[in-house]
């Protein structure tokens, strides 16, 4: 390890709208329950859709379930991988682990893992007797939900599995509601069709106990192709769904209007309780405009305009930002942090080595002036000198540290760990960094560097850390 100055092109902290940090208690938001084996510690699922299949098969991909404990990720793991002979409607079981979700599907009080490949998905459940696949859905084509989300989306009992659905050029929202075997597609109340969906997230923005879906997608109507929009969808199980527009080309100017929220094809969305008021908030990162917006949740739903916006161009260039984005409480104060990936950032002279930025939350929103920059070479204030070097690795060209990010409380202390994927490290084998949460933010004294070989995964096509359960 080398504690050195974090050299990131354009990494200078001179952002406007820096906020002060008010005192006061808030509702915790350390992340979802992902305790699969019921031992009291959250676990992590890592997808490796490019992992080679068994010799002689056309199958590919796997999911590694890594179990948490008081010291972080343990050596225990469970591998889900298409078996020889596995087919999905006559097609190979390929790209397993391309998407992951978690919920208590069978209502037994334990969280189940939902994973999918290109043509099928399955639900795996842990019991005292072991692990079993309790559901499998074979759709044989790519029109099923391809960005899985799970939980309570409608007002009927039972877990729903939903997501944006590709059907040729068009997108809709489809899903299996309340453990139904039938895949139901959503019709929209107007003449809109979604096109080119690029990002989606779910959360409870209005506090009614049901999840809403935010999606970045193009729109096509009688007027033709209308460009990227940020939509909010409430209860996709209804016969006709009304789309609420939070951002569209009409909110964009040249240069972009950061105050209004300008969705682009590369925009990423996530949800979490940034201001600690008990409602999830919607966060959008747009690398091409180097901007970040937050729509605050409230009982009547979010405002049509973002309540917080900032220009990130003095922090990192648009070419460096994204696609990693996660929201969760890292320091246990009840205000969720926003963690942004800059996977193509130049670090210590190494191009596309990657970095992540941890922005604290507060009762009034993100506190940019207290942001931390984390690379494999050190951690410190953005644009400053590394104060410590907890990761037992060094930045290398093309590592893509920050390509994927999730926040999960692995240790059970009420503070979320920031888990960062570097899928291109070591020639494509990949790596995870577990940055422990603490009362002062990301812990600077120690971290975990997790290589796939630790779990018997030894392919340079693993790209381990490219897909993480959120």
Which residues make up each language-model segment?
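Bacterial N-terminal signal peptides that target proteins for export
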Residues: 1-11
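Short glycine/acidic-enriched loop and turn motifs that connect beta-strands
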Residues: 50-55, 120-121, 167-169, 219-224, ...
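Acidic/hydrophobic-patterned starts of short beta strands in beta-sheet-rich repeat architectures
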Residues: 38-47, 107-116, 155-164, 207-216, ...
